[in-house]
Amino acid sequence: MAKVNLYISNDAYEKINAIIEKRRQEGAREKDVSFSATASMLLELGLRVHEAQMERKESAFNQTEFNKLLLECVVKTQSSVAKILGIESLSPHVSGNSKFEYANMVEDIREKVSSEMERFFPKNDDE
């Protein structure tokens, strides 16, 4: 283990001591929560955060690509469900039941979607 001498601000020093005190109050032994061990743990944690940030910069999230992929999946799902509803409405098991006629199923879905959308995106009086 390498030994390093460094200077830190009084604020950082007080915060590290506060962490040590809190751990001791929680029952940690004196030798388990030394200033050196706590400062080392915080330094390692800071390095991991720094590395994660650098990694994120290299492989930045592409919102446009995500939106495109999401829209593609939604359109595929919508198209598939429309075909399945069409097939289901022709089934002899549901013939004569207006609840399962294609036009009625579509209207029912639109009403339910509209209701859910209103919950999350209430309409303004201006619209």
Swiss-Prot record:
Variant or mutagenesis effect after changing R110E:
33,000-fold decrease in conjugation efficiency, but tetramerize and bind DNA normally
Fetch the CDD domains from UniProt.
Tra_M (cd14804)
Entry keyword ATP-binding: no
Among its keywords, does the record have Repressor? yes
- Name what induces it: Regulates its own expression from two promoters, requires TraY as well as expression of the tra operon for maximal transcription. TraM is in a monocistonic operon.
Query: Pfam families annotated for this entry?
Result: Tra_M
This protein's GO cellular component annotations are:
cytoplasm
Gene3D superfamilies to which the protein is assigned, alphabetical: 1.10.287.2320, TraM protein, DNA-binding (1.10.10.450)
Note the coiled coil stretches, chain numbering: 63-89
Q: Provide the assembly information.
A: Homotetramer. 2 homotetramers cooperatively bind to DNA although they do not contact each other; cooperativity is achieved by DNA kinking and unwinding. Part of the relaxosome, a complex composed of plasmid encoded TraI, TraM, TraY and host-encoded IHF which binds to the F plasmid origin of transfer (oriT) in a site- and sequence-specific manner. Interacts with TraD. Also interacts with TraY.
Q: What does this protein do?
A: Conjugative DNA transfer (CDT) is the unidirectional transfer of ssDNA plasmid from a donor to a recipient cell. It is the central mechanism by which antibiotic resistance and virulence factors are propagated in bacterial populations. Part of the relaxosome, which facilitates a site- and strand-specific cut in the origin of transfer by TraI, at the nic site. Cooperatively binds 3 regions in the F plasmid oriT locus; 2 are required for autoregulation while the other is required for plasmid transfer. Bends oriT DNA less than 50 degrees. Plasmid specificity is conferred by the TraD-TraM pair.
Please report which protein family the annotation says this sequence is part of.
Belongs to the relaxosome TraM family.
Listed name of the protein: Relaxosome protein TraM
Say which species the protein is native to. Answer: Escherichia coli (strain K12)
